[in-house]
């Protein structure tokens, strides 16, 4: 059985929660997690996810000793797939008919970031989210 950890996204200028970033299926044997995020619709397409995602990934790879973070995104969700690309994730493959939604099966894009790649990613300015 795995563990789940979540962080609430709270813009500094409003102090109001607008989403969550988290990991589930934490495999302590091989230091691997599956990431997820949900933001309020009015914050999608803004830099809020990039900032929060970088903070969480920095914590996972830096303080928690995670080796690999995976993300499985519906192939139809262009915005989420683009956000992971901007974070520096590598598209590793396509999981065919891997997610059920609306009574149908849909493909998912498999993304990953490994600790050695993340160490090459520049730090983010974090004062806008806490």
Annotate each PLM feature.
Residues 1-4:
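Active-site rim helix/loop that mediates acceptor-substrate recognition in acyltransferases
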Residues 6, 10-130:
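Acyl-donor (CoA/ACP) binding surface of acyl/acetyltransferases
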